UniProtKB/Swiss-Prot annotation:
Classification of source organism: Archaea, Methanobacteriati, Methanobacteriota, Archaeoglobi, Archaeoglobales
Listed GO MF terms: nicotinamide-nucleotide adenylyltransferase activity
Organism: Archaeoglobus fulgidus (strain ATCC 49558 / DSM 4304 / JCM 9628 / NBRC 100126 / VC-16)
Name this polypeptide is given: Uncharacterized protein AF_1488
Domain of life: Archaea
A single Gene Ontology CC term: cytoplasm
């Protein structure tokens, strides 16, 4: 039995937004399976990383399911916060099921995974000025219209967990 063609998408997903969704759907047109790797999994309840790894996986799965994505094609994994260098790229490659490529627009991530032997594929840009976690979190803090930038299921989960309030509390710490 031939192994499926598989790619890695590595991100913090704080939160999982429409840009992530578009990249995931684009990648599923090219690969049999995707590994969605949640980075900085040990960090939460901060302005940079307000959501837990479990919440981020929940957001991804619900958004993808709502879009009709076959979740048997999606593998989720987590990795704690670590510095970016080729040794950690090898660690990650051995942490997840075998992958053929990494999909990233981050030049530093691209370089270390290239140095570790993976093919690097840059996805198309999907309105990166809008679909950026830092911008979405800023809108949350300012009571702006962040909901139009995330899948409906993600907005519902953020509401359910009190995510905006959590982010505001994290931002108000001295």
């Amino acid at each position: 039995m031939a192994r499926p063609l598989r790619a890695l998408i590595f991100g913090r997903f704080q939160p999982f937004h429409l840009g992530h969704l578009k990249v995931t759907k684009w990648a599923l047109e090219k690969f049999d399976e995707l590994v969605l790797l949640v980075g900085m999994a040990n960090e939460s309840h901060t302005v940079l990383n307000p959501f837990t790894a479990g919440e981020r996986i929940w957001m991804m799965r619900e958004a993808l399911k709502d879009e009709g994505v076959d979740l048997s094609r999606i593998i989720t994994a987590t990795v704690p916060t670590m510095s970016v260098y080729v040794g950690h790229a090898f660690y990650i490659i051995n942490l997840v099921p075998k992958v053929d490529s990494i999909i990233t627009r981050n030049p530093v991530i691209a370089q270390v995974f290239h140095d570790a032997g993976l093919e690097v594929i840059a996805p198309p840009e999907f309105d990166r000025n809008l679909y950026r976690g830092s911008y979405i979190r800023k809108l949350m803090l300012e009571d702006g219209n962040w909901r139009e930038l995330v899948p409906k299921k993600v907005a519902a989960i953020i509401d359910e967990i009190g995510g905006v309030e959590r982010l505001k509390k994290a931002a108000s710490r001295d």
